[in-house]
Amino acid sequence: MLHLLSKDEFNSTLKSFEEQTESVSWIIDLRLHSKYAVSHIKNAINVSLPTALLRRPSFDIGKVFACIKCNVKVSLDEINAIFLYDSSMAGMNRIYDLVQKFRRGGYSKKIYLLSNGFEAFASSHPDAIVSTEMVKESVPYKIDINENCKLDILHLSDPSAVSTPISPDYSFPLRVPINIPPPLCTPSVVSDTFSEFASHAEYPGFSGLTPFSIHSPTASSVRSCQSIYGSPLSPPNSAFQAEMPYFPISPAISCASSCPSTPDEQKNFFIVGNAPQQTPARPSLRSVPSYPSSNNQRRPSASRVRSFSNYVKSSNVVNPSLSQASLEIIPRKSMKRDSNAQNDGTSTMTSKLKPSVGLSNTRDAPKPGGLRRANKPCFNKETKGSIFSKENKGPFTCNPWGAKKVSPPPCEVLADLNTASIFYKFKRLEEMEMTRSLAFNDSKSDWCCLASSRSTSISRKNRYTDIVPYDKTRVRLAVPKGCSDYINASHIDVGNKKYIACQAPKPGTLLDFWEMVWHNSGTNGVIVMLTNLYEAGSEKCSQYWPDNKDHALCLEGGLRISVQKYETFEDLKVNTHLFRLDKPNGPPKYIHHFWVHTWFDKTHPDIESITGIIRCIDKVPNDGPMFVHCSAGVGRTGTFIAVDQILQVPKNILPKTTNLEDSKDFIFNCVNSLRSQRMKMVQNFEQFKFLYDVVDYLNSGVNQASKPLMT
């Protein structure tokens, strides 16, 4: 069961589980490790997975568990409760993806979500927070290694985190080239830990190597290690034997000599550089290149390391005290090929050490394999067909309603204050929709959607798998006991009118559609169809009425549909039908059918045309709810119902400006009410802004004379 708790409820629930000594509960922190290291809730586990992995179905909960650094291994059945939190409500989409992995993995116990985010929780409950001191970037690191381990040392600088178009939130590419020899230890996708240690069986040459950790060195320890190893290493520290934190290494890594001469060159950390070429215990998304240094082993050819050939070179001597070869890694920007270089697969490169400069990945420079597609030229409608590079789209801006990074909205959206206000109102509606989606699988929630997927036969009735009705508002068919009463349709009660919003009928749901119309309408009814039968070469709706007056559509159960009248109105661009429904032992029913065939998917219609059509439809006799459908039953359907509501209310209720509070904005409240009864109503920003255009049209005083479509 999923529970969305406030900060006070979250704290009290945490304390209640802490008092239960026999219960096992996990507190999972989904923030970046840089924030987790500053402060976090007591006993919280940091799971800083890339968003791409969280959204990947193949990356199941078992792989998530493999990435969690925890000394105690437990199964899902042993965990009594799970507590999840992120920085703020903006991280709810990441929490939702992780919750889905727990549910698909068979975890059915309670999951508690912090709705206010960590910042609000930390300010109100500081006693439940653990704070640590961040390690500054300017402080060098050292690694504790067993004194008996006589190994060559790679001198690597600690670069500042850089962003790549593939992974904008992390300092490493999501894809690394293949055929790279594995590192000493298999790094996890968690940004702060190695999830596995190197075993003696896998790495027999490292029997004397002990786990190591990073901490700030002292001058005395550096001098003592220089006398032993010829490099600033410290003796082993037993206090950190059980820890193995991971320090992110981006492609922009610089070389360092053993005798640094500048302050920048003194920012060095060290890692063992001669791990044997054996398969690690588990493949990882990022690896530190590490090659064997013994003379009897063949060095990898240039083709095998071509993805790193731009910033990795082989050098005979890096440290004068080392007799074997090591690797020297330099940034790409500062590479210069020597004119006397020999054609032996490697080249001598000269550069100035710049450890704080990140990799720019310009289009004219060669790219490593994992980043080659990132700057691929593409087309965008904003540029009217011109080619542009993704890196030149401008700076990233914070996205308060979804992913952590997002491109800024189009310039035309923020061209004026009114449009910008409408844009951010729509994004707030999207955030509320995301919050409701967290309770889709909660049977006690108003947003539960379990009835739409109880069996395969029921799932086939949905035209789109991601658009289903809420169980609370769905239409239930009047069927015999033991038969499914499901249809993808929802009762909509807004204002003083009632509607039934549904998807377009499929070939297998024609009987369900007409049974719904028969049982929910009186002597007279109205159906509004807002889609064509085919759009862009794909079927959007099955024809559910006879072709002409001479033929009737007979369905199971004795239901008979015949066409009594047909008209076309070119000025309003609408076709009208009058259907007669007959059933044994029942009076006939007359259904007025309005087919608007010029309103295409994810667009908006002409204002004068749609307002004239709605005024005419409202004059047609109707004894029940109005049936409205497009293809999915959410975008055009929700926009039509919202426009109908705008025409029903007095003009003094309509907003005169867009810069109103959400609670005082009629359109915002109307769309939010529609979405609380059927998901994704008024599907995109273009349709949402169209509602404000309708209000401006009505406030301008323009009135279209309407005539009845049917008499």
Curated annotation (Swiss-Prot):
Function: Plays a role in inhibiting the onset of mitosis. Dephosphorylates sty1/spc1 and wis1/spc2/sty2.
InterPro entries in alphabetical order: Prot-tyrosine_phosphatase-like, Protein-Tyr_Phosphatase, PTP_cat, Rhodanese-like_dom, Rhodanese-like_dom_sf, Tyr_Pase_AS, Tyr_Pase_cat, Tyr_Pase_dom
Occurrences of domain Rhodanese (ranges): 21-130
Keyword Cell cycle among record annotations: yes
Biological-process GO terms, alphabetical: cell division; negative regulation of p38MAPK cascade; signal transduction
Reactions it catalyzes: O-phospho-L-tyrosyl-[protein] + H2O = L-tyrosyl-[protein] + phosphate
Keywords: Cell cycle, Cell division, Cytoplasm, Hydrolase, Mitosis, Protein phosphatase
Similarity comment text for this entry: Belongs to the protein-tyrosine phosphatase family. Non-receptor class subfamily.
Organism: Schizosaccharomyces pombe (strain 972 / ATCC 24843) (Fission yeast)
Protein name: Tyrosine-protein phosphatase 2
Gene that this polypeptide is encoded by: pyp2
UniProt-annotated stretches for the region Disordered: 275-306, 329-376
Cellular compartment(s): Cytoplasm
GO molecular function, one term: MAP kinase tyrosine phosphatase activity
Residues covered by the Tyrosine-protein phosphatase domain: 433-698
One Pfam assignment: Y_phosphatase
Gene3D superfamilies the UniProt entry points to: Protein tyrosine phosphatase superfamily (3.90.190.10), Rhodanese-like domain (3.40.250.10)
